[in-house]
Amino acid sequence: MAVKLYRIAWQRYSAHIRTADAALVAQLGRFLDLKPGIEETEPPGAVENLITIEESDGAYRIATSDWQLRAGNRGQLLFAALEAVGQIFVYEFSGAIFHAGAFLRGNSATLFFGAPQSGKSTLGFSAWRRGLPLIGDDRVVLMDEGRRVRPFPKCVKLRLPVG
């Protein structure tokens, strides 16, 4: 398969993905509810928002200008690629991003803040199971001087209870 350059855009921000794995890019688009496009040429400054994904002998390498990691299977690859896209968006975004979750109840959003592994995803999942729309479980954005809450792209991570 030929290596192509894809663009995933959110609001006015974009991440570019260089890969031969069109199925992965389509899966990322479905997961993020964003439509990937193909770029004919690399845009100026794309190195700052470029993710390179390569496969060799069943293992995957995911790299940005700041970091790289390896994935041993397709499931790990999807979550590593989602994390890379999220990191690109975090780097470019100038709004008020919080390490928090939020769900919608009527006309209001309820935000819940917490340290990593403190139960934000579990609380969000519980709210969703009760019919409350989940806005986000790990990163949310306050906009319009706090009058609007929006999700910030990052994959949901549910952890099994210990014990």
Protein language model regions, located:
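A noncatalytic interaction/capping subdomain that flanks phosphate/NTP-handling catalytic cores
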Residues: 1-116, 129-130, 140-163
